[in-house]
C-alpha cells in the first residue's frame, strides 16, 4: 500500500551520498526518515541522475535550502541511482558540486515503492514530493510527470501553510489571513 496524506511516512533506510560540508566533504552513510524525527522533512524523488530536468530541480531546492532550514525543515532527495552514481554526477556537474543536502540511493526501489512513485516498467521514480511533519506524518503529496519540473516556491508556500496549523484558502501566502 502506498502512503497517503495523514499516514505515517514509511521509514525505509537507504544508503546516501552526503556532500553537506561546503560542497567539499563527501561521505556515504545510511539514512532513514526516523533520523529526522522532531523536524519537518521535504522528501522529493526524481527519475535519474545525468538527465536534464532533474538538475534544475535539485539546484533550485539547494538554492532555497536556507528557506527550508528557517522553517526547521530538512531536505532530502532520492532516485533509484546508487550513492556512487550520485557522487559521480555531483563531481561532474558544476552546479551540483554545491549540494548541501543528502541524496538517497533507492537502488532496491523499496523507498520509492513505499511512497508510491516507482514505475517498474521504466525502473525509476516519478517526481514525487512529500512534506512530513515532526511526528513523521505525511501532510502533503504532489506527483509530477517525468518531464515536468516542480516549483520550489510552491513547496515552501505549502510548508508555510501547514506550519500555521490553520485553514489556509486558495492561493494563500504567508502574512495573509487564514480562515480561522
PLM-predicted stretches and their roles:
Residues 1-180:
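Chalcogenol-based redox active-site neighborhoods
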Amino acid at each position: 500500500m502506498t502512503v497517503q496524506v495523514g499516514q505515517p511516512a514509511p521509514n525505509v533506510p537507504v544508503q546516501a551520498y552526503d556532500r553537506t560540508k561546503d560542497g567539499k566533504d563527501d561521505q556515504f552513510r545510511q539514512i532513514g526518515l526516523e533520523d529526522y524525527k522532531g523536524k519537518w522533512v521535504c522528501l522529493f524523488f526524481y527519475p535519474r541522475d545525468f538527465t536534464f530536468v532533474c538538475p534544475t530541480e535539485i539546484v533550485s531546492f539547494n538554492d532555497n535550502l536556507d528557506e527550508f532550514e528557517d522553517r526547521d525543515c530538512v531536505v532530502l532527495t532520492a532516485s533509484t541511482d546508487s550513492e556512487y552514481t550520485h557522487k559521480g554526477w555531483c563531481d561532474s556537474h558544476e552546479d551540483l558540486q554545491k549540494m548541501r543536502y543528502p541524496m538517497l540511493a533507492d537502488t532496491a526501489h523499496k523507498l520509492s515503492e513505499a511512497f508510491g512513485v516507482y514505475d517498474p516498467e521504466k525502473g525509476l521514480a516519478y517526481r514525487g514530493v512529500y512534506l512530513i511533519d515532526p511526528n513523521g506524518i505525511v501532510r502533503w503529496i504532489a506527483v509530477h510527470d517525468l518531464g515536468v519540473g516542480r516549483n520550489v516556491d510552491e513547496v515552501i508556500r505549502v510548508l508555510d501553510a501547514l506550519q500555521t496549523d490553520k485553514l489556509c484558502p486558495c492561493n494563500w501566502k504567508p502574512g495573509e489571513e487564514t480562515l480561522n
